[in-house]
Amino acid sequence: MPGWRLLAQGGAQVLGGGAGGLGAAPGLGSRKNILFVVRNLHSKSSTWWDEHLSEENVSFVKQLVSDENKAQLTSLLNPLKDEPWPLHPWEPGSSRVGLIALKLGMMPLWTKDGQKHAVTLLQVQDCHVLKYTPKEDHNGKTATLTVGGKTGSRLYKANSILEFYRDLGLPPKQTTKIFHVTDNAVIKQGTPLYAAHFRPGQYVDVTAKTIGKGFQGVMKRWGFKGQPASHGQTKTHRRPGAISTGDIARVWPGTKMPGKMGNQNRTVYGLKVWRVNTKHNIIYVNGSVGHRNCLVKIKDSTLPAYKDLGKSLPFPTYFPDGDEEELPEDLYDESVRQPSDPSITFA
């Protein structure tokens, strides 16, 4: 039932108009159309349809959707479905596509010289190329590839979005990211992406959403020192102090002040890849990025010191059925001490 009801009638016929009624005619020959807007305050709010399903029906629907997703992924990997796009060699200045991965957690890792490093485990789950946009339709400089990561629920997706994934033959994704690529690194829509896209020893840039802290003061948000704790100070202990001067009579944009902290996308540059597990599609990245169970964006590092490392990487991406020989289950950097190596040796 709509929240607003529109009533439009004329003259004395509105709301039982009569001689003394609300809609009484003003006079002979002066009948006018009067517009009334009445708000309905007792309408029932809408609910999601699955709230009224039983537990057996919910499990049945989830199993049905899971089977359909597996069937779509299996049909997509059929090499006879259509012709692949031509592949081009790597050139200086080439830019590859990136990945979307799920943060599983953190663990320690040791190098052969005994140094300990904290690494983040990022798992690539159902990552596919969704859309190719040529540079003529983007900004005239670089083309883009839209990548989707981690299969999501289709129960709350709009019909237009479901139709887009249905045309691709893929299940709907939980999130999508856009990567700028060069013309020689273009990949066909529907191509699956694996953790072997990155190799141990290279450096990557990781973008993730920081943990939200809510509304915080300047001491926690920006690390301000604060005001003195005593000696005549009253109610100013954690305040920022002066935010401007009197002669300019304004506060400059960008002044550090209290506000919402966290819950923003932040990029960490130049993180080393220590290990790659090809069986479970897990990338071991140096440092801490994102929070647990969050989706992160990984791409080749754009720092000038690492721009020429791409010539030793699979280009434009790793193909399991390509010319490259079969990879082992675990790939390690040459400086990492593998878990199977003995920790103590005797001469």
From Swiss-Prot:
Region (Disordered): 317-347
Residue stretches of biased makeup (Polar residues): 337-347
Alphabetized UniProt keyword annotations: Mitochondrion, Ribonucleoprotein, Ribosomal protein, Transit peptide
PROSITE patterns: RIBOSOMAL_L3 (PS00474)
UniProt key word Ribonucleoprotein: yes
GO cellular component entries: mitochondrial large ribosomal subunit; mitochondrion
Residue stretches of biased makeup (Acidic residues): 321-333
Entry superkingdom: Eukaryota
Targeting signal (transit peptide) range: 1-40
Record GO terms (molecular function): structural constituent of ribosome
Compartments, as annotated in UniProt: Mitochondrion
TM segment ranges: none
Family: Belongs to the universal ribosomal protein uL3 family.
Subunit structure: Component of the mitochondrial ribosome large subunit (39S) which comprises a 16S rRNA and about 50 distinct proteins.
Family matches, as PANTHER family: 50S RIBOSOMAL PROTEIN L3, LARGE RIBOSOMAL SUBUNIT PROTEIN UL3M
Protein name per the record: Large ribosomal subunit protein uL3m
Species this protein is from: Rattus norvegicus
Gene designation per UniProt: Mrpl3
